[in-house]
Amino acid sequence: DNFSDEQLKEFVDHCHRNGQKAGIYWVPFTDWFRDPERKVEGTDTPYREVYLYANGKEQSLDGAWAIDPTHPAVKKRIDYFTERFHRAGFEYIKIDFLTHGAMEADSHADPNVTTGIQAYNQGMKYLLDAFKGKFYITQAISPVFPSHYAHSRRIACDAFAAITDSEYTLNGLSYGWWLCNAYRFNDADHLLMFREGITEGENRARVTSGVITGIYMNGDDLTLAGPKVAKERVKKFFTNAEINRIARIGRSFRPVYGYRPTANGRAENFFVLEQEQVVYVVAFNFAKDRPLEYTLAFSDLNLDPARTYSATELWSGVNEEFTMELKGQVPPADVQVWKIKKL
C-alpha cells in the first residue's frame, strides 16, 4: 500500500536483474485501518458498506475488520490491486488473513450466500481468476479447506530463530504433515538465522524445520546495512547441498510416531521421509540444557531389521552403519539429519 506503481515496478526490475522472481504480500478480505468512511480502493464505496457485521457490530479478528468477499466493491478492490501486481510483473504472492473472509455475518451482499465459507469460496474464486494463472499463490492465516485456491499454505504462524521457534513450526508439521496431499506444498515460511544469543545448533534446527516441512524462505536482513553475522550464518547454513536437495523434493516429512509430544504446543522429535532409494530420518533436540539420546527401531522406519544400512548425517558429514536400529545423540538445541541408503 505504501509503494507507488513506479516503485513496485522498480523493485520487480531489481529482482529480475538479480536473476530472481519478485513476490508481494497482500490481504484481500481485511481493513486494517478500521476507517468506515475511507473509500474502498478502486471505488467510491465507503468501507462501512463492505464490512461484515454480526449482531450489527463489525466483525473483528486479530485487530482488523472483516470485509465481505461477495460485495461488488470488494471485487473491484481485488481488480484494482491484482492489476497493479500484474503491471509491475510480480509472479509470487502471499495472501494473508483470509480467515476474515470466512467469518459468519448477519448477511452478505449476495443474498444467496448464507454462510461464511460460501462467501469465502466466492471471493477466493474471484481472486484466483484475477491472478490469471500467472502467480504462485501461498496462503497464510486461512481456513484449511477449501484447499484448491493456492499452491501452498503456511503450516504455522510467525516464527523466528530460536529452538522454540523451530518447535513451534514443527508443532504444525507434527499434526499437519498430511496437508501436503491437499496443497502442492506445505510452507514453513520465513526462517531466521540471526538473533542475539542464537547458536549454530539452533540455526541447523531452524533450517531443517523448514526443509522437512516442504518449502521455505529466508527472512534475515541481508541488505548492505544488515548485520554481518546474519549474512555469514545464511551463507553457511543455507548452502548445504544435501540439505537443500531434500527441500527440492517438496514433500512433508511425517512423524515417526505421531503421539509423543510432551504437552500442548510441543512437537514430535523424530520425522521420516521415505524415497525410492533412501530414507531420511531427522532427530530434533528441543532442550537447551541436555543432549538427547535416541534409538529408533528399523521397523518404525520401514527398514528391514535383518539388514545393515549405510547412513550419512548430512550436517556433519559423518558416515555410520546401523543394524536393527538407528541410534544417536543430539546436542542441546540442535538436530541430526540422517540419509540412509536402502540399496
List the predicted regions and their residue ranges.
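Carbohydrate-binding surface patches
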Residues: G210-T213, M217-N218, R260-L303
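Aromatic- and carboxylate-lined catalytic core of secreted/periplasmic carbohydrate-active enzymes
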Residues: V207-T262
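Short, well-ordered coil/turn segments that N-cap beta-strands
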Residues: N18-Q20, G89-E91, F131-F135
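Aromatic-lined carbohydrate-binding/catalytic grooves of carbohydrate-active enzymes
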Residues: D1-E83, Y92, H100-D110
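Solvent-exposed beta-hairpin/edge-strand motifs
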Residues: S299-G317
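C-terminal beta-strand-rich structural cap/linker in extracellular carbohydrate-active enzymes
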Residues: E320-L343
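Conserved, mostly hydrophobic/aromatic
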Residues: C15, I137, I212, V281, ...
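Glycan-recognition surfaces
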Residues: K39-K76, Y80, Q118, Q122-K228
